[in-house]
Amino acid sequence: MFIGIVSLFPEMFRAITDYGVTGRAVKKGLLNIQSWSPRDFAHDRHRTVDDRPYGGGPGMLMMVQPLRDAIHAAKAAAGEGAKVIYLSPQGRKLDQAGVSELATNQKLILVCGRYEGVDERVIQTEIDEEWSIGDYVLSGGELPAMTLIDSVARFIPGVLGHEASAIEDSFADGLLDCPHYTRPEVLEGMEVPPVLLSGNHAEIRRWRLKQSLGRTWLRRPELLENLALTEEQARLLAEFKTEHAQQQHKHDGMA
């Protein structure tokens, strides 16, 4: 997969190219990340990349010419079929469904804004889609771009050590992930749920699904509103709610 980055701070992406899952993907040749800085396309000796907005107001905008030239260079390197994405608070909010959708593209170009943003005409002429990672403001698009790269890379075959990992991630099926445990079996009096030690794979699957449903109901109930639960899922969620109510009643009685 090819990912081109247009950023004033390409050095920030060493966190992606040199470390962790994405770093291994780059080393294996599964992920090709290249970057272009608008500063390299500035025409003046000061390498100016910002300019005042028409109409006044605080802050500066990224200058059109260096930014467009950097995007064009990235497009030329990517070849036909590259999707150009601008990381923006006004964009579609990134979720697991969106990540899965983006992962079907073999070529992405991520444009990272700075200052107060970019000229609207650049968005109209150069950008295919706008994406956001949340309803808050950051200093630039680099961190959202890294978030997008990390999440999309998990779908590239061979990137994860276990191919089922991406399928079983939180949100992969619209639900939060279930709790996980490793050694020791007992930690400060807290025991690993016995079912996970039983070796009964059918019961383990059932327990994990129940916990996933229950955790979603407790922490992100709005996610359940968009799901058509199977008969088994509805039954397990009802069991979880009953067990949770009993635990709460027991806890309240001890208080």
From Swiss-Prot:
Binding site for S-adenosyl-L-methionine: G113, I133, G134, D135, Y136, V137, L138
GO cellular component: cytosol
GO biological process: tRNA N1-guanine methylation
InterPro entries: Alpha/beta_knot_MTases, tRNA_m1G_MeTrfase_C_sf, tRNA_m1G_MeTrfase_TrmD, tRNA_m1G_MTases_N, tRNA_MeTrfase_TRMD/TRM10
Key word tRNA processing present: yes
Alphabetical list of Gene3D superfamilies matching this protein: 3.40.1280.10, tRNA(m1g37)methyltransferase, domain 2
Keywords, sorted A to Z: Cytoplasm, Methyltransferase, S-adenosyl-L-methionine, Transferase, tRNA processing
EC number(s) stated in the UniProt entry for this protein: 2.1.1.228
Subcellular location: Cytoplasm
Reaction(s) this enzyme catalyzes, per UniProt: guanosine(37) in tRNA + S-adenosyl-L-methionine = N(1)-methylguanosine(37) in tRNA + S-adenosyl-L-homocysteine + H(+)
Sample GO molecular function, one term: tRNA (guanine(37)-N1)-methyltransferase activity
HAMAP family, A to Z: TrmD
Family membership noted in the UniProt record: Belongs to the RNA methyltransferase TrmD family.
Subunit structure: Homodimer.
Function per UniProt: Specifically methylates guanosine-37 in various tRNAs.
Protein name: tRNA (guanine-N(1)-)-methyltransferase
